[in-house]
C-alpha cells in the first residue's frame, strides 16, 4: 500500500466488509482478506542484542542481492559472507551456475557466513524507502533484522537458512 501512495497527493478510499478490506488509490484497488485469530507475538522473536550492526546503502545492497539471487534456484540460499570490511554475496545452483559480488561494509571481527532465502532478503530491502539500512546479526543460526537507518521505524525480521559447508 505504501508503494501505491504518493504522500500528500493521493487520496485513499477504504472499504471494509465482514471478511475483507479494500484500499483504492486512483485506478488501483488492493484487497486483503481479514483473518480471525491472534496475531503472532513477533516481539519475542526479536533479539535483544546483536554482535554486528552494519549500515549499508539500500540501493547498492538491493541491486547486488537481486543480481546474485538469479542464480539461487530450487531453494538455494543466498550466502552472505562477512570478512574485514566487506560483504560477499553468492549463490549457486548445480547445472546452472554461480554468481558472486562484493560490497564494502563496516564489518569487523571473526569472519561469518549466513544464508537467507533470496526472495525474503530482496522483499525486505524492497520494502523500505530509506537510503540506508542497518543489517543486524548475531550468528548464522539466529534471526537477523533489517532496520531503516533513517529512524522511520521500518523493521524486517529475516530467518536464516542453515548452510551446508
Where do the model's predicted regions map?
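DNA polymerase processivity clamps
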Residues: 1-35, 50-165
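Glycine-rich, pocket-lining loop/helix-strand segments that form or immediately flank
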Residues: 38
Amino acid at each position: 500500500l505504501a508503494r501505491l501512495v504518493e504522500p500528500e497527493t493521493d487520496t485513499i478510499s477504504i472499504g471494509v466488509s465482514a471478511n475483507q478490506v479494500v484500499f483504492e488509490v486512483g485506478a488501483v484497488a488492493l484487497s486483503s482478506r481479514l483473518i480471525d485469530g491472534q496475531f503472532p507475538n513477533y516481539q519475542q522473536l526479536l533479539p535483544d542484542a546483536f554482535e554486528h550492526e552494519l549500515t549499508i546503502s539500500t540501493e547498492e545492497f538491493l541491486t547486488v542481492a537481486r543480481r546474485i539471487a538469479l542464480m539461487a534456484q530450487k531453494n538455494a540460499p543466498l550466502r552472505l559472507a562477512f570478512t574485514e570490511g566487506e560483504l560477499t554475496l553468492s549463490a549457486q545452483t548445480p547445472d546452472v551456475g554461480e554468481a558472486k559480488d562484493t560490497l564494502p561494509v563496516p564489518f569487523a571481527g571473526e569472519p561469518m557466513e549466513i544464508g537467507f532465502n533470496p526472495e525474503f532478503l530482496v522483499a525486505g530491502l524492497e520494502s523500505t524507502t530509506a537510503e540506508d539500512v542497518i543489517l543486524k546479526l548475531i550468528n548464522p543460526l539466529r534471526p537477523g533484522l533489517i532496520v531503516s537507518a533513517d529512524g522511520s521505524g521500518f523493521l524486517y525480521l529475516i530467518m536464516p537458512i542453515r548452510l551446508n559447508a
